[in-house]
Regions:
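Conserved Class I SAM-dependent methyltransferase catalytic core
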Residues: 134-167
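Phosphate/oxyanion-binding active-site loops and adjacent basic polyanion-contact surfaces
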Residues: 1-4, 57, 141-148
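Conserved S-adenosyl-L-methionine
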Residues: 2-103, 108-112, 116-119, 166-167
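Short amphipathic alpha-helical segments, especially helix-boundary/capping motifs
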Residues: 37-41, 123-128, 158-161
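Mobile active-site "lid"/loop adjacent to the S-adenosyl-L-methionine
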Residues: 107-147
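Compositionally biased, intrinsically disordered low-complexity regions
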Residues: 15, 130, 162-164
Length: 167
């Protein structure tokens, strides 16, 4: 929780003039980073957007939004694979841009079944997709966080700010 608070303070500072800003987390879990950001900005001055592969985590985030006065953002909470099928897009199909993006992505994950699909998307994953599969028992993992870093950068508006927890 302390890391979330520090990230929010660094991104937002004490800017009381912010209004109508968008905040996004592509690997939100239960929303700790997003809630810290909303508290720093002011719950009535921001909209929350998220995606997480876990339905259970997404449901917990919805509950957290209700408990923290952010129920207007409930329709923006999506479950799914952010890297393979990002849920938040503009009308023209491009990745939606946000004022603030925070993320604590998975660091290592077994994703060889869709690695080549991600690698083929040279626009979104312009810095590449991990090749090396490290043998870690019981199954191989790859440094998937590098893909999330690229997704975060692609999701920032031209004046947007982001913060990512990395190993």
């Amino acid at each position: 929780r302390e890391i979330a608070t520090v990230m929010a303070r660094l991104l937002v500072g004490d800017d009381a003039q912010l209004r109508g800003v968008s905040c996004y987390d592509p690997s939100a879990g239960t929303g700790t980073l997003l809630l810290a950001l909303a508290h720093q900005i002011g719950e009535d001055r921001c909209s929350i957007y998220s995606q997480d592969i876990s339905e259970k985590s997404s449901e917990m985030l919805r509950l957290n939004l209700i408990l923290n006065g952010l129920s207007e953002s409930l329709p923006n909470i999506r479950q799914g694979n952010t890297l393979l099928e990002p849920a938040h897009k503009e009308a023209n199909g491009t990745i939606k841009k946000f004022d603030y993006v925070v993320s604590n992505p998975p660091f290592k994950l077994d994703f060889p079944e869709y690695r080549d699909t991600l690698a083929a998307d040279g626009i979104r994953f312009w810095a590449g997709v991990p090749n090396a599969v490290k043998q870690i028992k019981p199954k191989p993992t790859m440094a998937i966080y590098t893909c999330f870093i690229q997704h975060v950068l692609n999701s920032l508006s031209s004046r947007g700010k982001g913060a990512i927890v990395v190993p």
